[in-house]
Amino acid sequence: DLFALAAYLKEHAHQFYNNIDVTSFLLDVDAGWTFHSSIPIGYGAGSSGAYSAAIYKRYSVEKDNDLEHIKSDLAVIESYFHGNSSGLDPLVSYSDSAFQIVDGIPHRKEIEPEMSALFSLKDTRIPRHGAPYISLFKSKMENKELSNKIKTTLNPAVHNAINAMLIADKDELRKEFFKIRYFQL
């Protein structure tokens, strides 16, 4: 409901570094504005991030280019869909760039095209929403045994996969992806 989103943006206006022109947003909604994306909506694959980025790109008034401020603003918008957000997914969509977070600060990273080509989204046509899975994950993290396995097995594999991606090491990336897939079984 775009009208509910507009009300949310107005209610949270004090949280933005860059103001959001809610009036123009409402006028466009009244005029039939819609969102089109190649990311399937409602599958938990990043559509809320793309949607948040599109709103921000079109309706943010001041253009403070500080990445941390933009990420924070985008987190406020995406929180409408999930209850909370790091802002990273919409930042990736907004800037059409990859980022590495170092000490909580986003740093833009170039990814070699042949590395990006290793990934694709498959539309299963099975709608899903990310929020219930996020809640389930948080509740399962209360299990100390699982939490420890994630910290000692999954997290290192994810970090190693990211590093392999950044240095364009396909063999290492495949090896780490195998570890990630195996962990999920």
Where are these regions (language model features)?
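C-terminal nucleotide
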Residues: 1-21, 25-30, 36-37, 41, ...
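Glycine/serine-rich anion-binding loops at beta->alpha junctions
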Residues: 36-58
